[in-house]
Amino acid sequence: MLSETKVIEIYTDGACSGNPGLGGWGAILRWNSHERELYGGKEYTTNNQMELMAAICALNALKESCSIDLYTDSVYVRNGISLWLENWKKNNWRTASKSPVKNMELWQALDGACARHNVRWHWVKGHAGHPDNERADALARKAITEYRQNGYFKG
């Protein structure tokens, strides 16, 4: 059952050292005075894939269905989820030009993660001083740094 009274704020970001290259994602989940930071990464990936992973992992971390305000600085994620996704599904995961949707598995995972929740998507300008977006970016970069130092992702 969807908890309409519990509204979660989520801030997500992805980063890549080389594109493609070593990548990280970060997310901040906030409910009232409670806050949780998540981060992780992948050895060989793209920035867009990490942006998607940040949202997927944040949504999947929630144990119950909630109302969510999700903030991303990715125009790709915002447009994909808000403008393109329904048509991709109707067109058997093909774009309007009939080519296969890039990152289809991640889009499908995001669609599935969203299905449990009432998600309102918000775009924020990246690297423009928004404190929570900057923190999500720092978490994504932390994942990359930790991998370089340890040889694995700790997050």
Curated annotation (Swiss-Prot):
Database matches in CDD domains: RNase_HI_prokaryote_like
Domain RNase H type-1 as annotated: residue spans: 4-145
Documented EC number(s): 3.1.26.4
Chain residues that bind Mg(2+) 2: D13, D137
Leading EC class: hydrolase
GO annotation, biological process: DNA replication, removal of RNA primer
Cofactor note: Binds 1 Mg(2+) ion per subunit. May bind a second metal ion at a regulatory site, or after substrate binding.
Chemical reaction(s) catalysed: Endonucleolytic cleavage to 5'-phosphomonoester
Cellular-component GO terms for this entry: cytoplasm
Location(s) in or outside the cell: Cytoplasm
InterPro entries attached to this UniProt entry: RNase_H, RNaseH-like_sf, RNaseH_domain, RNaseH_sf, RNaseHI
Names of required cofactors: Mg(2+)
Alphabetical list of HAMAP family matching this protein: RNase_H (MF_00042)
Function: Endonuclease that specifically degrades the RNA of RNA-DNA hybrids.
Protein name: Ribonuclease H
Source species of the chain: Bartonella bacilliformis (strain ATCC 35685 / KC583 / Herrer 020/F12,63)
